[in-house]
């Protein structure tokens, strides 16, 4: 896994575990869940995405792409969430989060890769179906963000989201189709086993917990996947789900998302189920 040379050299002098993260960031949620499952003490550094704190020179000296999370372990910097949770499990062996069986280990690794690939679609769907009520940037603020942020891929995405009232149908259909395909594959795997990579909870489950939670907030029809729904029900029984994910949401935030989703559907007809493969009955 890639260890990053920090632009901020003072990070090399940091003792202990440090996490720069966003409350609602799904990638941050993965890392917090892993830290909680492994009962590790860590230092929290909140980066407010709505306030564009990820676009500051100070933060981009920590994370060169201006994304969250960033993680430091006694001076060692990592920036990809699946790399971070794998690092934590390999370097802090108490409460192992990897399967014992070699075949299951390969399954886990493949689903970590899939979770990473699914991130772009999760981002697009979240911004469309949950984050639209966020205050729009003024033209001056958007210009400043574009100038200050080093990550041009993110800048292009934010500009498109800020300027338009809805992403293109082509993009939304594609993101829905790919997400539905992943969920269907997970549902099929979970038909014959308790967890994604066997009979033990692993990093694969942690990597996908935030995604399913996020989709539940936007009223994604999870009842299309009976086994995945059963899995999510047992996930929610883990204290790490509550402590490291739900408790970081502001009071009433989940209810606010759900109310917005319902209101938008009534007023405009726009809802995630109006796109891609979700417009068709679930495959049996």
Task: Give residue spans per PLM region.
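Long, positively charged, glycine-interspersed low-complexity recognition regions
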Residues: 229-284
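GST-like fold's C-terminal all-alpha helical module
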Residues: 120-237, 284
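Positions that flank functional sites
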Residues: 49-50, 201, 250-251
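Active-site-flanking alpha-helical
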Residues: 89, 211-212, 245
